[in-house]
From Swiss-Prot:
PANTHER family: RADICAL SAM DOMAIN PROTEIN, SLL1084 PROTEIN. This is Uncharacterized protein MJ0966. Signal peptide: none annotated. Binds 1 [4Fe-4S] cluster. The cluster is coordinated with 3 cysteines and an exchangeable S-adenosyl-L-methionine. Its cofactor is [4Fe-4S] cluster. It comes from Methanocaldococcus jannaschii (strain ATCC 43067 / DSM 2661 / JAL-1 / JCM 10045 / NBRC 100440) (Methanococcus jannaschii). [4Fe-4S] cluster binds at C178, C182, C185. Residues 164-381 form the Radical SAM core domain.
């Protein structure tokens, strides 16, 4: 019996330069490539219009504000793909997919490695663990995930580009999930429990990945790279290979001489998140002033040219004094390092976190402008996201099915906010919740 080849698309609903640096895209493509009766293609905003007469279209949702692109893509493709099922997955789906439930046929909640859930969905088998579909009569869905991270489903072949966030590099995922307790962090919740890869596996993957992709750079991927038990040994191995090492994130309290000597970073990134020690303790961001001071000493010792600090404002219990301490901490760093930048954005109360029912602080915009003004005179550059974009992120993160009618005709964050404001619904999604929202039906 001859099996019919099925055409399957994986779409990253944004530009190529963002999608090519997304490990999930490579994981999905590699995972589906093992099925011989599937013809799999990867697409981005620039080329999705080539998709015609496909059987299944998977869209990975990494960021809430990509929903606008995703909805447009679905509307465009349904015309030329009348028999296709549209499937969503990714961190946003684990967080809360209900605002976009109307637009997709199926949601896969969780991590697909070690399972055949994608193949089952392609074959129209929806009544399986980890799958939510409007064609099924069930209101709850339980996340699926591999108990251990192995090399079996890891994408050694990864098409690369200088345009990507990491340039031409091999993406090496050290671990998934985070052992820290930060109360605001979505990743801690949706990727629990934290799992790290074996050192031998990482060495093998690095060697093969560099050889197969003909690159001389390895980007280390994990919520907190420095928390990996064998990080120094791994970096020594990569250094001996003669490749450049690019860590995605390092905590101030995990830095040491050995790590700095190997990494030789030109820019050191530190995320205190809050300016005062009191507020950091409250959000369980366990970084002390002495940890930051030690990181700055190491930066000076190893010739770091620039330090970038990441902060949030609008944190519950925050006071004017906390804002002043944020400013003073940044000034202290500037006295030690010539070039200092900070990124400051409002805290988004995310589903499944300790702050999921808290209100979004609309006064954050004024706080950010105040910080910018105070630091500009010190020669410190202050970066921040578009405020409407952050408001929209909160709305979409905590929204319900009623948002779909607004998303149906809203082309961007500003138009969605305007529509909700007109119908006096902004406070429903930005204000304090009395209880958990619809995301309580997603069991992590």
């Amino acid at each position: 019996m001859i099996k019919m080849i099925k055409n399957v698309a994986i779409i990253y609903p944004n530009k190529f330069k963002a999608g090519i640096s997304c490990l999930a895209v490579h994981v999905l493509a590699n995972h589906l490539s093992k099925y011989r009766d599937l013809n799999v293609g990867v697409y981005f905003l620039e080329n999705y219009d080539r998709i015609k007469n496909f059987d299944a279209i998977f869209i990975t949702l990494q960021y809430e504000n990509d929903y606008f692109n995703a909805i447009k893509i679905i509307k465009d493709l349904r015309k030329n793909n009348p028999n296709a099922i549209f499937v969503a997955g990714g961190p946003c789906v684990m967080e809360n997919f209900f605002p976009i439930a109307e637009f997709f046929d199926v949601f896969i909640v969780g991590e697909i490695e070690g399972s055949d859930v994608m193949l089952k969905v392609i074959n129209r088998e929806f009544d399986v663990e980890g799958v939510y579909s409007k064609y099924l009569e069930k209101d709850k869905v339980k996340r699926i995930y591999p108990k251990k991270l192995t090399i079996d489903d890891y994408p050694i072949y990864q098409p690369t580009s200088e345009e990507g966030a990491y340039g031409k590099s091999f993406l090496l995922e050290i671990g998934r999930g985070c052992p820290r307790r930060c109360r605001f962090c979505l990743a801690r919740a949706i990727y629990y429990p934290p799992r790290f890869r074996k050192l031998d596996d990482l060495m093998y993957l690095a060697e093969e990945g560099v050889k197969v992709n003909k690159v001389n750079k390895v980007a280390l991927i994990a919520p907190s790279v420095g928390d990996y038990k064998y990080i120094v040994e791994l970096c020594n191995f990569l250094d001996d290979m003669g490749v450049h090492i690019s860590p995605s994130s390092l905590r101030a309290d995990t830095l040491n001489d050995d790590l700095m000597r190997i990494l030789k970073p030109k820019t050191l990134t530190i995320a205190p998140e809050a300016g005062s020690e009191r507020l950091r303790e409250f959000i369980k961001k366990d970084i002390r002033e002495r940890d930051i001071a030690n990181a700055i000493d190491l930066a000076k010792k190893f010739g770091v040219e620039k330090v970038k600090l990441y902060f949030m404002v609008g944190i519950p219990t925050e006071t004017d004094e906390d804002i002043e301490e944020l400013i003073n901490l940044t000034k202290k760093v500037k006295k030690e390092i010539r070039k200092v930048e900070i990124s400051v954005n409002p805290m988004i109360p995310k589903p499944h976190t300790d702050f999921e029912v808290e209100e979004f602080d609309l006064s954050s915009k004024k706080k950010i402008k105040y910080i910018e003004k105070a630091l500009k005179k010190e020669g410190i550059r202050v970066e921040y996201e578009n405020f409407n974009s952050m408001i929209c992120q909160c709305i979409l993160a905590r929204g319900d099915e009623n948002l779909s009618k607004y998303l149906d005709y809203s082309k961007n964050p500003t138009s969605l906010i305007s529509a909700l404001k007109k119908d006096r619904l902004l406070d429903k999604y930005l204000g304090r919740f009395e209880d958990k929202g619809v995301w309580k039906n997603i069991i992590l």
